[in-house]
Amino acid sequence: VALIDNGIYVDGKRTGNPHTLTETYELMRERHGMAWIGLYRPDKEEIQSVADEFALHPLAVEDTLGGHQRAKLERYGDTLFVVLRPARYIDAQEVVEFGEVHLFIGPGFVVTVRHAENPDLAKVRRRLEANPELLALGPEAVLYAVLDEVVDAYGPVIAGLENDIDEIEDQLFGGDPAVSRRIYELLREVISFQRAAGPLREMLDSLQRGADKYGVDLELQRSLRDVLDHVLHITDRAASFRILLENALTVHSTLVTQQQNDEMKRLSEASLEQNEETRKLSETSLAQSEEVKKISSWAAILFAPALIGTIYGMNFTYMPELDWPIGYPLALLGMLLSGVILYRVFKARHWL
């Protein structure tokens, strides 16, 4: 049901509880009171009924039907069209949830249209009904009360964001790999919050500038200034959060780059150490190879005389060379020549 609550107020006191929009219009005209109509996600017919009754501007009606509007204040003749973006901090999920409420403020009527559960306008209505003197000031009192409720609800959001940012600062230097994503998420929430709360400064300034022209009560003007002071404090805090998070992103990027550089340096040092080990192994292998060459060369040189000596040391009956007068000198000469030849060959090949 789109019609959540509506009533007719005379001198700040509720005088009736009509159940339909038609009954509301009739009772308003009958008692010459202020109508406060509360709608929740109304359909086109319900919005059009209100628009026809109070001569609402088609552009404002179109914005209300479409929803998803930025915070703004527009004046169409004697009617104010106000869009507010309330917010609340969901502690369990550590996120900021945004709502949307539209207000039509005109002579003798207030129409509130909520597109989300937030804010709790029933609480605002109860507080005003408990203070007939304030409610008797007319539709502007309702606007003030809704603004005050929305801005007051920004306080816990600021506190929640501040707590999250404190946690980020701890994670930033703790080496948490997920910190960059969390910083980005928080920065996105802070920017969304700035878009919701930022326009309120100009909106409240505009209301104050037109207060005298439209006969707004002086006490109500002072209350609006108090809301403005609260808004200025909140928007300044949000701006400081944004700067902190942007700096945190820069610091994190620097830390990541430094870690990458340190890792590359470590890998380079490890590679150099490995290359040095490889070089040493190569030198050792080369040295061993040279030693093997020398040993093999000398073994070959010694092998040739040993081979000749072994051949002529065999105990065969028939070995003609043994009867030669020059056999012994020839064997010695063969041993010597084979050793010299092999030595010169190995020397030429740098094996010795």
Residue ranges and their predicted role:
Residues 232-352:
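Hydrophobic alpha-helical transmembrane segments and their immediately adjacent juxtamembrane loops
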Residues 1-240, 269-290, 321, 351-352:
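Peripheral, non-transmembrane regulatory/ligand-interaction domains of membrane transport proteins
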